[in-house]
Design a protein with these regions (language model features):
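Short active-site-adjacent helix-start/loop capping segments
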Residues: 12-15, 48-52
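Short glycine-enriched loops at secondary-structure junctions
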Residues: 43-48, 93
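Short, intrinsically disordered, charge-balanced linker/junction segments flanking boundaries
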Residues: 1-4, 178-185
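Catalytic domains of carbohydrate-active enzymes, especially glycoside hydrolases
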Residues: 1-12, 31, 38-44, 155
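Glycine-rich, proline-tolerant flexible connector loops at the mouths of alpha/beta enzymes
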Residues: 8-20, 165
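Generic detector of contiguous secondary-structure segments
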Residues: 16-30, 185
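Active-site cleft segment of glycoside hydrolase catalytic domains centered on the general acid/base Glu
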Residues: 22-26, 51-152, 158-181
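Helix C-cap/helix->beta junction micro-motif
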Residues: 34-39, 122-124
Length: 185
């Protein structure tokens, strides 16, 4: 079985409250289904340093202003439509959001926990987690943030062999050592 990461954005999938536009996602998900791929859905309310994008009807909420019920409802609609989705990530490059805003970690932990519980009631087999950029975590010593936000069913990592200036200077041997640090974090 193959696997695909699919990025769906709330402002595209539900541009009007309660009205879903499946035109783009049906094509992407249909191709994955046709090729027997399972899907990890990135429905990120956190994208690195930014929140969203959110639909206009939601506006630009702060982290504690995100309506959990609306998020659960939208995710439920997506998961009910696409049974090939077996894992969901609602925060990508999560470490970047909290690098200078650690005081909001408890707010996000509560939001995540409530959304997790709401999704698990209807979709108990779907795995739910957060994603981190390993190279950022290592280059900026953000392991503590990963440890605090290692909640849900899994922790996902992306990786680029870059230094703190975002230049590719790491040898394959150093990159392998970096990747092995996933098991230490």
């Amino acid at each position: 079985i193959g696997r695909s990461n699919v990025y769906l954005f709330w402002n595209i999938i539900e541009p009007v409250e309660g009205e879903f536009d499946w035109s783009q996602s049906d094509i992407i998900m249909g191709l994955n289904e046709k090729n027997d791929h399972k899907v990890t859905l990135y429905f990120s309310i956190i994208n690195g340093e930014t929140l969203g994008p959110f639909p206009n009807w939601i506006g630009k909420p702060t982290l504690n202003g995100i309506n959990e019920d609306e998020l659960v409802n939208t995710l439920d609609n997506i998961l009910s439509r696409y049974n090939i989705v077996d894992s969901v990530i609602i925060a990508g490059e999560t470490e970047s959001q909290f690098r200078y805003n650690e005081q909001f970690i408890p707010v996000y932990q509560e939001l995540f926990s409530n959304v997790y519980d709401g999704i698990k009631q209807k979709h108990p087999d779907v795995k739910f987690g957060n994603s981190f950029a390993l190279h950022q975590v290592l280059n900026k010593n953000l392991e503590d943030i990963v440890n605090e936000l290692a909640i849900g069913d899994f922790v996902a990592f992306s990786y680029a062999p870059t230094d703190i200036l975002n230049e590719i200077r790491k040898t394959p041997e150093v990159a392998i050592k970096d990747l092995n640090k996933i098991f230490e974090i």
